A protein has these predicted regions:
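Short, contiguous pre-domain boundary segments
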Residues: 8-18
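Short, structured coil/loop segments at alpha-helix boundaries
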Residues: 6-7, 94
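Conserved AMP-binding/adenylate-forming core of the ANL superfamily
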Residues: 41-100
């Protein structure tokens, strides 16, 4: 079963296999890496910075998104943020929010 619309559907999905037995990525970065490997050139997200006439949208592929997320991770690491640290931020609804 791939999707669900009711509580019964959810129960059916959960009955298929225990979550720990599924081949699920263990982190968001692992998810992005797996998706980049499978669909690197496909669109991951599109955004439009301005809403003026003639403003064009920008689209990031899964490879682009993975690259930007890696850049952000490298920045945090260079600032001394480690694996067990927590980073919180407040940002507007922009593409930078998605890649940070």
């Amino acid at each position: 079963m791939g999707s669900f619309a009711s509580r019964a559907d959810l129960k059916a999905i959960e009955a298929e296999a225990a979550w720990e037995d599924r081949d699920l990525p263990r982190s968001m970065y692992a998810f992005l890496s797996r998706t980049k490997d499978a669909h690197g050139a496909r669109p991951a997200l599109s955004y439009q910075l301005l809403s003026t006439p003639g403003s064009k949208s920008e689209t990031l592929t899964w490879s682009d998104l993975h690259g930007r997320v890696t850049q952000a991770a490298n920045l945090f690491r260079s600032l001394g943020v480690g694996e067990d640290d927590v980073v919180a931020y407040v940002m507007p609804n922009t593409v930078e929010t998605a890649v940070t």
